[in-house]
Every structure is written in structure tokens, then in C-alpha cells.
């Protein structure tokens, strides 16, 4: 998840490296939105109902990692709606998901690829998707933006970066090969089936995107 690298300079004053200076982008590979989900016992089916419930009884919000994209997305929703989350930090997404499935936490914002199987199995209830348009894969569930958080969009993007000293010829070769592989019919179908968008970029395009993020 290369998004974490883009977030770090804004959160930490003493990094041992500068992502923009020390890394060179090869290409983006895939992007997937975040899903806002709750434990099935939570008596809410919409964002408005969830926000109203949180104001009467603060809900435990599982954070996959402090300062992660899902954490910041949860904070953005809280600030925009007035929701009351009690943040519970974890050291990774798998434990955050496990505790939400188990009911120790009631709310979770997490990447679609890791979270969707638990929605499909009924272990988690989907409230909204952090994409500007609805996704047929999840039955047209309303987006968070549609439910009152104007223009809200967040997600997880995967890509490959190398040390800045990597020769341009190697970056170009890796870019070409990875783009070819990720666009192949079977790989694309598998990623799309899990809720990801296949996204490839040239080396300069990925550099511009990464620095903008």
C-alpha cells in the first residue's frame, strides 16, 4: 500500500527518509475504495442512522493503523457528520477486521479487497463505499458522498516504487512488464472481481501522482 508513504510526511516530523526524494515510482497497479462497515448487531443500515446512534452511545471504531488512510478517512467522516467514534488502534488490518467481526469493535473503515469477503459472508454489514459512484459489485450500495459527505472519496492504491538511484532504463523495463502483466485478462478479472480497479501509469505519470498525493 504505497498510499501510506504519501501520508507519512504530513503526519511525522522526523522521518528517516523523504519519499519524494528517496523513492522513484515505477507504476501504479490497482486502486480500491474503502468500505464503511459495522458489526451485524449494530442497528443501523445507513450513514445517517449510524451517526445518530453514535451520538447516543459512542461506538468503537477499529483503526487498522494510526495515521493510515482508513484512519484518516474515518476522521474525515466523523468531522463531516458529527459522529462520535471511540478509536481503537490495531497493528494491522487483519486484527481490526477480526475484532469487528467478533463484535469487540462496532465500526470499521478498510480497503475493499480485504473487507468485501466478510460483507458477502454476512459477518459484516455494509454502510457505504468511499467512491464517487456506486459499484455494481456490491449491489449498488449508496456512496458515503451520496449519504451527505459531499465529494467524499478515499481508497487504497497499490504500486511499485524503487530507490531513487535506480537507473531509468530499469524503471522503464519494469514499468512495461508490470503494465503488461496487470492488464492480462486473468489478472484483471481477478482484481476487478475483488473490487479493485486496474490502473497503470508511465513512470513520469506515477511520479506526478505520488508527489501530488
Predicted regions located by residue number:
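Paired acidic/hydrophobic, glycine-rich loop segments that form the ligand-binding mouth/hinge
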Residues: 1, 60-62, 106-110, 125-128
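Extracellular/periplasmic bilobal clamshell ligand-binding domains
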Residues: 202-213
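Small-residue (glycine/proline)-centered packing/hinge motifs flanked by hydrophobic/aromatic residues
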Residues: 13-20, 133-151
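Short beta-strand and adjacent tight-turn residues that come in two discontinuous sequence segments
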Residues: 28, 90, 109-110, 129, ...
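Hinge/capping helix and adjacent helix->loop/strand transition within the periplasmic-binding protein
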Residues: 10-95, 144, 157-190
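Conserved helix-loop-beta element of the AMP-binding
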Residues: 24, 50, 123-136
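Short helices/loops that flank or line small-molecule/ion binding pockets
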Residues: 54-57, 75-80, 94-104, 108, ...
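Beta->alpha turn/N-cap motifs
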Residues: 1-4, 8, 93, 110-115, ...
